[in-house]
């Protein structure tokens, strides 16, 4: 799956900008990135949302345990990969039909967060049990919400293209060609929200997240880590 967002929607994370500046490397534009995804995945589907957002996915080379799905409801777009262990109980909690799958559930959970503000954003993902990565884009508010499960069982990466777009994908090689060293693995147990202004841990929302510069031989430009209480105490 692939989500590409212009700087009008999300400001490129400073840590990824810095990583690309430390070790200059070839990049391509967001348009070239989307084109490459569509060309290398014959069954791919892409959706253009206005001038600033492109979402794409494919069932090609899909793991039976990590199926990809896409849905749109009430101008909320969602790409989901993985499976939820507690889908049944969550359907009841949100009053959904038994036919509702994970991607519909995530849209409803996000909508509950948006409409019940100030509802803590970490609650959207904190009660999801299983392995997952998802990208939510709310067209009505131009809000982006991205999350990865606490164990990082579903791969998710993010980077910055040559034209300053922020891209998320489950394929590191795809992003490497477009983002160079402005690339990192999306940290497990975390969510990124333009509504709250950045990256947070949904297990420990008050804990600081730092970006550690990666060695030159690594594919990444940086590694994001959630600091624990002991680490925070030592740095205060």
Q: Where are the predicted features?
A:
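Cysteine-centered catalytic environments shared across enzyme families
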Residues: 1-236
